[in-house]
Every structure is written in C-alpha cells, then in structure tokens.
Amino acid sequence: MLPLSSQCSSFFLPSFLFSPGVAIFGHPGLLVSDSDISRTQKKIKANQDPWTTSWNTLTNLPFSDPSYTPSPASAVYRSTWEDHTANAQLLWHDVAAAFNLGLRWKISRNTSCADAASNILHAWATTLISIDGGDDKYLTAGLQGYELANAAELLRDYQPFVDNVLPSVVEMANNIFIPMHYRWLNHEEPSEHNVLHFFANWELCN
C-alpha cells in the first residue's frame, strides 16, 4: 500500500493525469454544463432556494434584460494609455450581459434572451480590432476573453447564433484574444520579466 502522503497526493492530482486517451469537450463547457442547467431548472421549478432567489436576482438585473444595447469599440484600453481614454468597462459590461442573457436562455429557453446575447457577441466580433495599452491589456484579454467564450458556449444550441454569429466570434478569438494569451504565457512581453511587477494571477487569467 502507498504511504499516506502518496495517497493524499494522488487524491488531489487532476483526474486527466490518470485518464487514457483524449477527453472529448462537451458543449456547453467551461463554467456551465448541461447537467448544471438541468439541475437548476428542476430546483427553480420546485421553488427551492437558493436557486429560485438567485434566478429572480439574475432576471431583474439590467445586464440581464433582453432590451440591453451593446456598446462595442474598435480598440479597448483597460487604463488610460497615451492619448487614449480607458474604455474597457464597455467590454466588461457587454460581455457580462451576454453571459447573463445566455444563461437566461439556457434555463428558460426564452429566445429573446438568446437573440440579445447573440446580438452583443455579434456587435463585438464585427467591431473589435485590438485590445491595447499597457501590460494590463493582458488582464482584459484573459478575463473578458474567458467570459466571452462562456457566453458563446451557452448559445451553442441556438441555431441562429451558430449559423450567423459563431464564425465571427471564433475569428475574433483566434485573431485577437488567443494570440495575446500565447504571447503572455510564452513570456514574450519584455516587461513580464520584472518579477516584482507581475504575479501568478496574471498567468491564471490567461
């Protein structure tokens, strides 16, 4: 038998280290799965808390309203940079709204929520050209990029989104977000080598 320390170490190791072959990614993935949605629907139908209270809170947020209007920008700056004013809050708010509306769609099957989320993602995918500025641009690429991907995942079973919007969202991810992740994780940014300036959470974001 393995010593206790080895048993404990094995228990906390990621399961994929022991799994043969390649795991298949299931849609939706990342933060929310179909089993999560199914469980939540049952809890809300049974009027159980905290699910019902949380659902009511979600549906009453201004960032969950199907009438939400996105404000896409061609360039995003997390902080003021040279003669550019910080405007990253536009992306923060819109991506949060896309996720909320996507979640409402998955739980309620209300197509107005799916259309609104799809509209937000389409607006950014057809407008955004760059995430720029200082080093903190990598935080925006990581944090909002991940949230954007989650919003898109929630719409993977909404055919109008899949047919008309998903390709442009994938293109945006491949051309703007993912290259920034690779640049950061590969330590290609000169300032990244200042160990007093950056911490592990920057890499976790990417």
Regions found by a protein language model. Give the residues of each.
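Extracellular glycan-targeting catalytic surfaces
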Residues: P20-E189, H197
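Fungal secretory targeting signals
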Residues: M1-A23
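Helical hydrophobic small-molecule/effector-binding pocket
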Residues: H193
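Internal, conserved structured core segments that host functional sites
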Residues: F198-E203
